[in-house]
Swiss-Prot record:
Protein name, per record: L-cysteine:1D-myo-inositol 2-amino-2-deoxy-alpha-D-glucopyranoside ligase 1
Cofactor(s) the protein requires to work: Zn(2+)
Gene: mshC1
Chain sites annotated for binding Zn(2+): C47, C232, H257
HAMAP family assigned: MshC
Enzyme class: ligase
BP GO terms, sorted: cysteinyl-tRNA aminoacylation; mycothiol biosynthetic process
Origin species: Corynebacterium urealyticum (strain ATCC 43042 / DSM 7109)
Short sequence motif named 'HIGH' region, residue ranges: 49-59
A Gene Ontology term for the protein's cellular component: cytosol
Motif ('ERGGDP' region): 188-193
């Protein structure tokens, strides 16, 4: 599946600073392991959308987080292999299509196209591999077979196959949650703890046997379709290898999704740890209230763009808060971002020596390399009034994706 056009990302002046990010598994900020893989690249996998509804600013903020991370790596001279999936076969998609009386494939295609447009508007660097679940069914089948062969999965009636949480000794290391919280989140976030016959309520579905009215693919263990978590396990490891630098997504994916996608890959491929970093972005609220379609308070990137808001201002509004925090979006925050952008553009005419400009860029690099500290980065640039020349402007484009 194709992604969206690449934005122009200029080279950045100054001295590279190793990127440090907060790792959910280790519960600390630590340096990203940028040891190149066999292809000389640093691997990053970010979970994509389930295309049953329009993506909103909360989704966009997550992808802006990992766009920032990739920009820091690129500015440091690393080659990045970025992979993102699309969960284009899943219950929410089928349910929404049935409710609206449309074909689930058509619904998925329409929402994927809208997402591509939003990402292009925001100058998000696209993944090299943009992979739908339907494209990767054979890869999922192979991984499910590996789990079965390893004794890490078992079959129940109706052709369903589940992976055992005790297949790896380290299950739970990624999210660091206690058992009670795992059970709560599992039930709330797509799990089926009450499924009769499961060895453990937390065992996750990796293959759903065929039901009438649902799409199905043939497999050695019967017709059916992939479970949610194993899709990402297969897509990521088939492109980035059994161990790679960063797995990312929203904070709501830490458990169960990232915990299980890591566990499935580790059990199937017999590796200790799938990703060096598990990185999670906070949620976005509108005027202090979590964005929800039922509340009618979703903010859409394409609507903001149609209303004449500069994409760079939208990025700055998101960057006003730290990526790991649950944070707010409002008309006032967007207006402040637009004022900031205007002010910076006026500063572009300021005369400053190359040495002075490079000093500002070095400070900006260091701040962003410290767990993508965008609030401090914006404060630094606000304080550089009159010090903005082309060297700094280019750094803003390369590191922040903000064009002045």
């Amino acid at each position: 599946m194709h992604a969206w056009p690449d934005p122009s990302v200029p080279a950045v002046a100054g001295t590279p600073v190793p990127l440090k990010l907060f790792d959910t598994a280790d519960q600390r900020v630590k340096e990203v392991d940028t040891t190149p893989d066999a292809n000389g690249e640093v691997g990053m996998y970010v979970c994509g959308i389930t295309p049953y509804d329009s993506t909103h600013l909360g989704h966009a903020a997550t992808y802006l987080t990992f766009d920032l991370a990739q920009r820091q790596l690129l500015a440091n001279g690393h080659k990045v292999h970025y992979v993102q999936n699309i969960t284009d076969v899943d219950d929410p998609l089928f349910e929404r299509a049935e409710r609206d009386g449309v074909d689930w494939r058509e619904l998925g295609t329409s929402q994927i196209n809208l997402f591509r447009s939003d990402m292009e508007i925001l100058s998000v660097i696209p993944p090299r591999d943009y992979i739908g679940a339907m494209e990767s069914v054979d890869e999922v089948i192979a991984m499910v077979q590996q789990l079965l062969d390893a004794g890490a999965a078992y079959e129940l009636d109706q052709g369903d196959i589940y992976a055992s949480i005790d297949a790896t000794e380290q299950f739970g290391y990624e999210s660091n949650l206690d058992r009670a919280t795992m059970e709560e989140y599992f039930a709330e976030r797509g799990g089926d703890p009450d499924r009769e016959g499961k060895r453990d309520p937390l065992d996750a579905l990796v293959w759903r046997g065929h039901r009438e009215g649902e799409p199905a693919w043939d497999s050695p263990f019967g017709p059916g379709r992939p479970g949610w978590h194993v899709e990402c396990s297969a897509i990521a490891t088939n492109r980035l290898g059994s161990h790679f630098a960063i797995q990312g997504g929203g904070s709501d994916l830490a458990f169960p999704h990232h915990e299980f996608s890591a566990a499935h890959a580790e059990a199937a491929l017999k590796v200790e740890r799938m990703a060096g970093h598990y990185v999670h972005a906070g949620m976005i609220a509108l005027d202090g209230v979590k964005m929800s379609k039922s509340l009618g308070n979703l903010v859409f990137v394409h609507k903001l763009s149609e209303a004449g808001h500069d994409p760079s201002a939208i990025r700055l509004a998101v960057f006003a808060g730290h990526y790991r925090e649950d944070r707010d979006f409002s008309d006032a925050i967007l207006a402040e971002a637009e004022e900031r952008l205007t002010r910076w553009r006026e500063q572009l005419a300021g005369e400053v020596s190359e040495a002075e400009a490079t000093e500002v860029v070095d400070k900006l690099r260091a701040i962003l390399a410290d767990d993508l500290n965008t609030p401090e980065a914006l404060s630094l640039l606000d304080g550089a009034a009159g010090d903005c020349n082309q060297i700094i402007a280019t750094a803003l484009d390369g590191l922040l994706g903000v064009r002045i």
